[in-house]
Amino acid sequence: MNPHYARLVTLAAVSATAVALVLFIMKVFAWWHTGSVSLLASLVDSLVDIAASLVNLLVVRYSLQPADTEHAFGHGKAESLAALAQSMFISGSALFLILTGLQHSLEPQTLHAPEVGMWVTLIALVATLLLVSFQRWVVKRTHSQAVRADMLHYQSDLLMNGAILVALALSWKGITRADSLFALGIGGYILYSALRMGYDAVQSLLDRALPDDEHRAIAEVIVNWPGIRGAHALRTRRSGPTRFIQLHLEMDDALPLVQAHQIADDLEQALLKRFPGADIIIHQDPVSAVPENQRGRLTA
């Protein structure tokens, strides 16, 4: 396991948990003073943030463990499980917000001291923006699915905090239904984000292939490699930080085994330069053993 990867994803998970805990305490104070249903929505979301980030932290630490005899391909799939668990947490909080918003839209309530809620929400907005910026930086360098799921979660919090600021300001001006209507909109958006996150996690657990641009990058390395007649049966997937790449090379029938092995080794090193840390399996086929309709199937 790359120690740089481990350090970054662990730091991102710890940072998210700490920010969620501080914001939760602040929002409890603000909700107690204002009675705002939008702030209640934000408070519940922060509580879910804490639970989700704690789960994320534990799972990330587990996923960073090296491969062992019982898990020969490592523990990277734990990241996808964390993302799936987060989507369930978030869906539950979103449904709660929608139901609460419906109730308060039917029975509008006057807010108390909305300026307190506005200040707390503004602080939460800035803190969340800083956290999301850091998480995005980590995702660009690690491609961690667990950190990406957490980042998407906190991105929805940015929108939510902005909406709460507007709702509190409108309620301050006497538009009492604004608070509950914004809570409904926030709940709907969070539910959509949760479902999208869950879909991506399930696709990873089902070993979805690497993105098209990465497939093209693999093909660009292979197709013009000296000593091969073609390539086929490219299969890829990702588990946590590790890409898995498998393919078959077509080689001259008379090529000595030692030379064929060296060509495959050199190609593997070239792919590793393009995709550091990848797990690569290359099978060498005599070209006569490959059916004509399968030869050279891999193109750039």
UniProtKB/Swiss-Prot annotation:
Function: Divalent metal cation transporter which exports Zn(2+), Cd(2+) and possibly Fe(2+). May be involved in zinc and iron detoxification by efflux.
Record's keyword annotation contains Cell membrane: yes
Entry keyword set: Cell inner membrane, Cell membrane, Ion transport, Iron, Iron transport, Membrane, Metal-binding, Transmembrane, Transmembrane helix, Transport, Zinc, Zinc transport
Entry protein name: Cation-efflux pump FieF
Topology of the protein relative to the lipid bilayer: Multi-pass membrane protein
Family: Belongs to the cation diffusion facilitator (CDF) transporter (TC 2.A.4) family. FieF subfamily.
Compartment(s) of residence: Cell inner membrane
A cellular component annotation (GO) from this entry: plasma membrane
Binding site for Zn(2+): 45, 49, 153, 157
